[in-house]
């Protein structure tokens, strides 16, 4: 399966006693909210998380493009991830963030409702998109079902995640295509 998750960065995995395990590979994802769903992108592609800066609208841009922003002198396009993924519109509030994401040679901003946390997932915690189905397969890598929240590389009984936690794992490159 690791060949099917090429954009992830393997990390050191530790067992319940904190000892490093080399037989498993963990992949890191940044989780965020869009509406009532939790989505995640490979952490390796996320360059920065920003409070929403002033966005300049671009005439005749596609509906999904909110506009452009200047980040340290670099002009960056910002897309509304809700529109791209056909999630109902929502307000921009104090939790809203812009993720600066690199895909290929381009960096684009993605507007999300809130950033949650970084998850480390084992290969057996990921169901590939072919098992998911639907019309969003181009964007969806798969589904993540974390067994436990891993804090500082360790998993403890107090860190158990909700068994109903489901992360919709996204491919960055198709999301950023214009």
List where the protein language model places each region.
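An acidic, low-aromatic, low-complexity terminal/linker signal
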Residues: 1-178
């Amino acid at each position: 399966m690791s060949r099917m998750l090429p954009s992830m960065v393997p990390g050191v995995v530790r067992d319940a006693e904190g000892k490093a395990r080399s037989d498993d590979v963990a992949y890191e994802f940044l989780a965020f909210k869009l509406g009532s769903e939790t989505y995640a992108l490979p952490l390796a592609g996320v360059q920065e998380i920003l409070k929403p800066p002033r966005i300049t609208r671009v005439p005749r841009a596609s509906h999904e493009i909110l506009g452009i922003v200047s980040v340290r002198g670099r002009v960056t396009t910002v897309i509304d991830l809700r529109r791209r993924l056909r999630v109902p519109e929502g307000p921009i509030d104090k939790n809203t963030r812009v993720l600066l994401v690199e895909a290929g040679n381009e960096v684009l901003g993605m507007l999300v409702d809130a950033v949650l946390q970084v998850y480390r997932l084992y290969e057996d915690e990921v169901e590939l998109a072919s098992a998911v189905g639907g019309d969003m397969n181009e964007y969806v890598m798969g589904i993540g079902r974390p067994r436990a929240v891993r804090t500082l590389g360790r998993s403890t009984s107090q860190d158990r995640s909700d068994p109903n936690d489901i992360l919709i794992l996204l491919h960055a490159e198709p999301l950023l295509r214009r």
